[in-house]
Amino acid sequence: MNHTKSSFIKLALECQVLKFGEFTLKSGRISPYFFNAGLFYHGNSIRQLGQFYAKTLLEQEISFEHLFGPAYKGIPLATATAVALAELGRDITVTFNRKEVKTHGEGGQLIGSPLTGRTVIIDDVITAGTAFRESQTLIKENGGILRGVIIALDRCERGLTEKSTLSEIREQGIEVYSIINLFDLIEFLKNDNQYEQVQKLESYHELYGAY
C-alpha cells in the first residue's frame, strides 16, 4: 500500500471518521464499518484532507479548470482541495450549489465561479448517486463539461442491481477516482494484523460487493 493511502486511513481513524463495528446503513444493510467525512472538522484535518484530494486529482492527470462541491459535504471538501491545489501552484476556481434556489440578492442556485469549462466533482462518497445526478445536471445546464469525480472512499458495493452506482457512472464515460477503496482498508487491516476485522469486511463484500 502506498504512503498516501495508509496516511489517509490513519487520519480517518484518528478523527473517528472511519469506525469498525456494526452499523445499519440507509439501505438496511448491516455494515462492519462506517465512514463519515463530516467528522473531519478540525482545521488541521481539513487541511490534510484537501491535500489528499489534491494529490489524488493530480495523479489522474485530468484536464480541468473548476471544482464543484455538491451541498452540503462537498462544499468544504472542494474548498479545501482548491486551497491545497493553490499551494501546489494550481489556481483552480470553486463552485457549489444551494439546496434551495435563492430568489433575492444575487439569486440562483450556484455560488462561486461560473460553470463554463471543464469541471471535476469533489464529494465524500457516492451511494445511490442522487447528489451526483443533480450535480451532473447543474454542470451541464450551466455550460460546464464534467471531466471526472473524486471521492474519499469507494465502498466497492453494488446498489439495488448487480452493478455499483460508480459502475453506472463510468458507463457514461465519466471516470470516478477515490483516495481509498474497500480493498485498501482490507490491506491496511492485514498489515496491522487485524484479521478478525479483515474477515468481517471480506464477508460483507461477498454479500454486497461490486466487482
From Swiss-Prot:
Catalytic reaction equation(s): orotidine 5'-phosphate + diphosphate = orotate + 5-phospho-alpha-D-ribose 1-diphosphate
Q: Which residues form a coiled coil?
A: none
Report TM segments: none
The cross-references to Gene3D superfamilies, in alphabetical order and at most eight, read: 3.40.50.2020
> Where does this protein hold orotate?
34-35, 127, 155
Quote the Pfam families the UniProt record gives: Pribosyltran (PF00156)
Q: Which GO terms describe its cellular component?
A: cytoplasm
GO terms, molecular function? magnesium ion binding; orotate phosphoribosyltransferase activity
Pathway assignment reads: Pyrimidine metabolism; UMP biosynthesis via de novo pathway; UMP from orotate: step 1/2
The EC designation for this entry is 2.4.2.10
Q: Could you say which residues bind 5-phospho-alpha-D-ribose 1-diphosphate here?
A: 26, 72-73, 98-99, 102, 104, 123-131
Which top EC class is named for this enzyme in its record? transferase
Q: What's in the keyword line of the UniProt record?
A: Glycosyltransferase, Magnesium, Pyrimidine biosynthesis, Transferase
Give the required cofactors: Mg(2+)
One biological process GO term for this chain? 'de novo' pyrimidine nucleobase biosynthetic process
The UniProt family comment states:
Belongs to the purine/pyrimidine phosphoribosyltransferase family. PyrE subfamily.
* Complex formation: Homodimer.
Q: What does this protein do?
A: Catalyzes the transfer of a ribosyl phosphate group from 5-phosphoribose 1-diphosphate to orotate, leading to the formation of orotidine monophosphate (OMP).
Q: What is this protein called?
A: Orotate phosphoribosyltransferase
What gene does this protein come from?
pyrE
